[in-house]
């Protein structure tokens, strides 16, 4: 109501505001719904601001860990107010690789590449949804593969990862 010229798009709530708005807020109140429903604490809330279709601000809140990541274009990325950077892992064999659901990769015929990547990295973990992307931006993991993403899944992640140097 305060900014009627802004558009709001949400995974759960549809959209409101002018379709051609220069500023658009993209919300995912529970990213990782399956984790949330099953009591797995790897879910979060995603908020993004797009200006002229480009993500310029991203927020990832992980309630279970009490961590809040904020990434803004030209401002860097912080976790609970402290700057973070992606890791500078020099070799694939030293990398930590996270992924969500591998079934879409198999359906797309990417099984051999997926298995080869798993063989070459140091650690493989199934840390899904925003949690895995959070870990990459915070410098705690190196690679995250999430083969099925919608606007509300990725809009907040982009400024966070890029602001951390990724």
Task: Write out the residue ranges for each language-model feature.
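Short loop/edge segments at beta-strand edges and connector loops
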Residues: 10-12, 81, 128
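N-terminal subdomain of lithium-sensitive/metallo-dependent phosphomonoesterases centered on the IMPase/IPPase/PAP
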Residues: 1-30
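Acidic active-site catalytic centers that drive phospho-/nucleotidyl reactions
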Residues: 11-12, 28-31, 35, 142, ...
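DPxDG-like acidic metal-binding loop motif
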Residues: 19-78
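Short, solvent-exposed loop/turn motifs
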Residues: 55, 83-85
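An extended, acidic
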Residues: 85-166
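Short, Asp-centered acidic motifs that coordinate Mg2+ and/or phosphate
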Residues: 7, 57, 142-143
